[in-house]
Design a protein with these regions (language model features):
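Transmembrane-helix bundle of Major Facilitator Superfamily
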Residues: 2-187
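Cytoplasmic-side transmembrane-helix entry/capping segments in multi-pass membrane proteins
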Residues: 84, 136-149, 197-207, 232, ...
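Interfacial helix-loop-helix linkers and transmembrane-helix boundary segments
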Residues: 73-74, 78-80, 136-137, 194-200, ...
């Protein structure tokens, strides 16, 4: 008896296309930029520390606001928050491309992280809402496969553009892709939200943002100052205690941002584990000589 064929509806196909393109923005931008860093550094006269913050300013805001972005999507509408994130990401990409100083680029990259925090969790949550149990695994598999391919393609593109002195084009490419995703999402993909999300878990949002920001900042600055530095230890301790408090709050909150029972679902845990591996791979790609010491 042959395996049952999974056919996607028209809405599901457009949803898959939109989320793949949106994720491609983030993956290509991250991996292509890594290869173009030497050209960028030479053009803008960026110091080693500033170069680190071009990358890590993005990572700090992305990691700190990631769960908040997902929670806002459940509460106010996944498409709405996704598109707001897409708008922030594309506008900040334009600002990155026209930056004339290291400070301008670092600030624009930080706003890219804010946009990515609204955009990234939206991709998977929109997929999960539009695909049933039978087709969800296949859809997430396709999403992750194409995301991996774009992560591989990114360095090739970045090296080619950097070689021609066109590193700014890496950021400008996000604009037409964002327009395509924006139109497709509005016209073809219906809005969805979590019907059980009644209000924002404010304490959870504050604790998880503080926790992730503290941990991320501590690890970002540890190569420069060392783990024995008081600021680094304080940052890591505050971040760690905040995340522990976040878990406790989620256990007893009436409106938890991240219900702990979700981890009993193999689909949820597997999807998040897959995302972790993909972004861990990107984190490895983003290491540069300055970071490696």
């Amino acid at each position: 008896m042959g395996a049952k064929k999974t056919d996607f509806s028209s809405i599901q196909k457009w949803t898959l296309l939109s989320t793949i393109l949106a994720s491609s923005l983030v993956f290509i931008d991250s991996t292509a930029l890594n290869v173009a860093l030497p050209a960028l550094q030479k053009d803008l006269g960026i110091t080693g520390t500033q170069l680190l913050w071009v990358i890590n300013g993005y990572a700090l805001f992305l990691s700190a606001l990631l769960l908040v972005g997902g929670s806002l999507g459940d509460l106010f509408g996944r498409n709405k928050v996704f598109l707001i994130g897409l708008g922030i990401f594309s506008i900040s990409s334009l600002l990155c491309g026209i930056s004339q100083s290291p400070l301008q680029l670092i600030i624009a990259r930080s706003f890219q992280g804010v946009g990515g925090a609204l955009l990234t969790p939206g991709s998977l949550s929109i997929l999960s809402s539009q695909f049933g149990a039978e087709s969800r695994g296949k859809a997430i598999g396709l999403w992750s496969t194409f995301s991996a391919l774009t992560a591989i393609f990114g360095p090739v593109l970045g090296g080619w553009l950097a070689g021609m002195g066109l590193w700014r084009v890496i950021f400008f490419l996000n604009i037409p892709l964002s327009i395509v995703v924006f139109i497709t999402m509005i016209v073809k993909v219906p809005e969805s939200r979590n019907p059980n999300a009644e209000k924002l878990d404010v304490w959870g949002a504050l604790l998880v943002t503080l926790g992730l920001a503290g941990i991320t900042y501590g690890f970002i600055e540890s190569p420069k100052y060392g783990f024995g530095n008081l600021l680094i230890m304080f940052s890591l301790l505050v971040g760690g205690f905040a995340l522990i408090a976040f878990i406790i709050v989620q256990r007893y909150s009436k409106y938890p941002m991240m219900p702990l029972k979700l981890f009993k679902s193999s689909t949820f845990s597997g999807g998040n584990l897959l995302t972790l591996f993909v972004y861990a791979a990107l984190g490895g790609v983003e290491l540069n000589p300055a970071e490696a010491g």
